[in-house]
Every structure is written in structure tokens, then in C-alpha cells.
């Protein structure tokens, strides 16, 4: 058995919300399981999913993923799933309470960052707790990114 520090985690990313880090200031991230049907898992394994317009919300003491798009599995015929149905997220009670408190008291948002398969083959969602950025914050982020690109170009040219 290998020592604990030498474990490698292999994550196959299926869908990523690339705009989330631009539109939100990420405070904390959580790993949540997804309650999926068989055809949804097969569709995910094909790498077809979109979480760009999705969000998570708290309803009745549970966290739900809303508006995520998992296309129909072509070989499933009449037993297919709804493409944009609400999907329950599996989190521990302590994590749910922490997220509810942050959303209700501090006005934060629950943003899905990416869906991936962990080393055991389970579909997981990386969920972020974040605050929405104002327009001037977004401009500042893009200016900083442009400056870093220019700086790297200059350093590369000078050798």
C-alpha cells in the first residue's frame, strides 16, 4: 500500500463553467456528489454536458443543481431523462448548514465550477461559494490578466 502523500487523483473533467471565475469572486469550494439516472451517467461519460448557465440553490434543507444541461443518451430510446431537470447534490449536513448560512446571511451565491469523474468513477460537482463581481472588478481582472500576458512576452523575448 502506498503512503498517503503519494496518492495521485485522476479527474476526468466533463464540463467546466469557465465564466464563473470571471463573474464571481470565489471564496470557498466544495465537492458534491450528484444524484443521476443511468442515462445521465452514460451521457456524462460521453463528455456532453453544459453547466455554464446553471446555479445551485437551497430548498428544504437540501442543495439542488438547477438548469444544468445533460443531453439525451442516444441509445436509451423511451427511457431517456429530461435534459434540464433539477438534480440533487449530495453534501454532508455540516456543509449544507454552512452553505445555507453563507447564502442567507452574507448574500453569497452557489456556483457550479465543473463536473468530473473521480478516481472511483463517481460523478462529482465542484461547487463554489462566491460573491458576484461588480463591473469595475471585472475590468480590473481583465487588465491584470493582459498585463501578465505582456510581462510574460517581454520576459520570453529577453530570454
UniProtKB/Swiss-Prot annotation:
Its localization reads: Cytoplasm
Sorted alphabetically, which InterPro entries does this protein's record hold?
SmpB, SsrA-bd_prot, SsrA-bd_prot_CS
Q: Where is the composition biased (Basic and acidic residues)?
A: 137-159
**Molecular function via GO:** RNA binding
This protein's UniProt keywords: Cytoplasm, RNA-binding
Show the Pfam families listed in the entry.
SmpB
Please give the GO cellular component terms listed in this UniProt entry. Answer: cytosol
Q: Using the UniProt record, give the first listed, main subcellular location.
A: cytoplasm
Q: Does the keyword Cytoplasm apply?
A: yes
Q: Does the keyword Transcription apply?
A: no
Query: Disordered: where is this region?
Result: 133-159
Name the PROSITE patterns on file: SSRP
One GO biological-process annotation of the entry reads: trans-translation
Stored PANTHER family: SSRA-BINDING PROTEIN, TMRNA-BINDING COMPONENT OF TRANS-TRANSLATION TAGGING COMPLEX
Q: What does this protein do?
A: Required for rescue of stalled ribosomes mediated by trans-translation. Binds to transfer-messenger RNA (tmRNA), required for stable association of tmRNA with ribosomes. tmRNA and SmpB together mimic tRNA shape, replacing the anticodon stem-loop with SmpB. tmRNA is encoded by the ssrA gene; the 2 termini fold to resemble tRNA(Ala) and it encodes a 'tag peptide', a short internal open reading frame. During trans-translation Ala-aminoacylated tmRNA acts like a tRNA, entering the A-site of stalled ribosomes, displacing the stalled mRNA.
Q: Which family does it belong to?
A: Belongs to the SmpB family.
Q: What is this protein called?
A: SsrA-binding protein
- State the species of origin: Sinorhizobium medicae (strain WSM419) (Ensifer medicae)
Whichever gene encodes this chain, its name is smpB
Amino acid at each position: 500500500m502506498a503512503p498517503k502523500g503519494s496518492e495521485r487523483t485522476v479527474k476526468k473533467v466533463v464540463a467546466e463553467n469557465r465564466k464563473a471565475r470571471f463573474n464571481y469572486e470565489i471564496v470557498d469550494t466544495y465537492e458534491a456528489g450528484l444524484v443521476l439516472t443511468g442515462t445521465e451517467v452514460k451521457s456524462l461519460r460521453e463528455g456532453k454536458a453544459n453547466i455554464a448557465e446553471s446555479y445551485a440553490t437551497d430548498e428544504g434543507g437540501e442543495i439542488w443543481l438547477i438548469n444544468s444541461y445533460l443531453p439525451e443518451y442516444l441509445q436509451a430510446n423511451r427511457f431517456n431523462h429530461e435534459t434540464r431537470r433539477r438534480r440533487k447534490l449530495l453534501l454532508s449536513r455540516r456543509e449544507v448548514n454552512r452553505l445555507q448560512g453563507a447564502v442567507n446571511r452574507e448574500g453569497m451565491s452557489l456556483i457550479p465550477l465543473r463536473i468530473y469523474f473521480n478516481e472511483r468513477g463517481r460523478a462529482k460537482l465542484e461547487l463554489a461559494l462566491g460573491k458576484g463581481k461588480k463591473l469595475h472588478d471585472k475590468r480590473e481582472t481583465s487588465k491584470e490578466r493582459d498585463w501578465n500576458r505582456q510581462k510574460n512576452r517581454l520576459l520570453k523575448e529577453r530570454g
